[in-house]
């Protein structure tokens, strides 16, 4: 009974931290759109998208690799032994994203200022740090501390952003506030001081596989605004799509925080009972996500646009059909997230990567074949096609007998 209460309390703390994280994200976006307008906020939205990609490449996979490795080892020694390779990965990603932002600065941000690549590099480096800190806290069973880390990151951004906008209404200043979120990690300096055990260094291939897979997942879910800009969508349309995604990703953001509670138990379940023990949960997640996506489409078509305008201001909402399709895609993303965590817990690197490669290929095919829908319609159709394939492929991989 005491163990159940403790687990419920820890899950409740993670839920609260995830909700705070989501609300602070909304607050940051609303602060930007109301202060800078739809067009003024557009370059900040692009930096936000880079941060989402960084979280996909670094925060999520590092966090879950740390939790899984500590569950298998029973101590952080293996994580400490492989930390150098993980740091090189994080540094390479940060440098690569910064160079991309520098090379494509005018097309993405509207000018060639150094502010944008510096901010992009900063958010990427911070994403790696947060993955390590959150993973060590959760892997050590300190779920309440992990909840504070999850919720506090965007609270720091919101507070710093409000202070900087009080100094001057500049998109560059607001983008700089995004870099400050990982300062919350300073509350747990010992999370970065892991003791070596002298054992063999564990394989870090799962970090790369999960990083690639979750990057592809975030390209699908968060890549719409820059893709829309590349296809010729105006700044107002980019902000409208970003605002719709920001609203309907709320459950996804909450679920991201809760996944840290699931990885260790799922890992132990697979170790004790085999990968087949995940067959029923995988199929249930797939069926539920498809069914709920249909309901989300029907509700968001009429109700979504006025809600988006109320939250983020005039000119920030797409049409009803697009809004409904964005909502459906975000619900499908919840299912693909659940299946991704199951595949990570099972150590199924090949199936994990292949499921998301297939999803991106499906999205690209739909994007190429729907030219008559216009830029916004093509992007949203590709989102839904990719998520459907990701859900189906992930469930099929876990349902296959081994």
Where are these regions (language model features)?
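Interhelical loop/hinge segments that connect adjacent transmembrane helices in multipass membrane
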Residues: 1-7, 144-149, 171-172, 177-178, ...
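Signature of the first transmembrane helix
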Residues: 6-63, 208-235, 383
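Membrane-water interface segments that mark the loop-to-transmembrane alpha-helix transition
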Residues: 9-22, 47, 51, 56-105, ...
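Interfacial segments at transmembrane-helix termini and the short loops linking adjacent helices
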Residues: 38, 104-120, 235, 302-334
């Amino acid at each position: 009974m005491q163990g159940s209460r403790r687990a419920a309390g820890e899950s409740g703390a993670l839920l609260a931290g995830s909700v705070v994280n989501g609300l602070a994200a909304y607050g940051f976006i609303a602060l930007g759109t109301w202060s800078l307008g739809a067009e003024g906020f557009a370059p900040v939205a692009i930096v936000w998208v880079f941060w989402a990609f960084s979280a996909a490449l670094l925060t999520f996979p590092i966090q879950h690799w740390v939790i899984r490795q500590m569950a298998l080892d029973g101590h952080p020694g293996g994580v400490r032994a492989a930390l150098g390779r993980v740091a090189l990965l994080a540094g390479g990603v940060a440098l690569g994203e910064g160079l991309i932002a520098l090379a494509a600065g005018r097309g993405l941000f509207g000018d060639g200022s150094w502010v944008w690549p510096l901010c992009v590099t900063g958010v990427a480096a911070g994403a790696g740090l947060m993955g390590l800190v959150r993973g060590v806290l959760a892997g050590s069973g300190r779920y309440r501390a992990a909840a504070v880390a999850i919720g506090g990151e965007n609270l720091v951004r919101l507070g710093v952003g409000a202070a900087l906008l009080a100094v001057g209404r500049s998109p560059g200043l607001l983008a700089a506030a995004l870099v400050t979120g990982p300062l919350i990690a300073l509350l747990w300096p010992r999370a970065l001081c892991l003791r070596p055990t002298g054992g063999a260094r564990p394989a870090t291939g799962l970090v790369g596989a999960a990083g690639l897979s979750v990057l592809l997942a975030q390209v699908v879910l968060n890549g719409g605004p820059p893709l829309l800009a590349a296809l010729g969508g105006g700044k107002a349309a980019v902000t409208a799509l970003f605002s719709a995604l920001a609203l309907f990703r709320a459950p996804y953001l909450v679920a991201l925080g809760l996944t840290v509670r699931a990885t260790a138990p799922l890992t132990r379940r697979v170790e004790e009972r085999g990968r087949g023990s995940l067959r029923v949960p995988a199929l249930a997640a797939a069926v539920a996500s498809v069914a709920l996506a249909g309901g989300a489409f029907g509700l968001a078509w009429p109700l979504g646009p006025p809600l988006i305008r109320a939250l983020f201001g005039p000119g920030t909402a797409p049409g009803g059909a697009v809004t409904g399709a964005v909502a459906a895609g975000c619900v499908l993303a919840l299912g693909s997230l659940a299946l991704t965590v199951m595949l990570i817990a099972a150590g199924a690197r090949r199936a994990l990567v292949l499921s998301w490669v297939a999803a991106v290929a499906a999205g690209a095919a739909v994007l190429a074949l729907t030219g008559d829908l216009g830029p916004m319609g093509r992007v949203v159709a590709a989102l839904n096609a990719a998520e459907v394939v990701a859900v189906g492929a992930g469930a099929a991989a876990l349902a296959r007998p081994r």
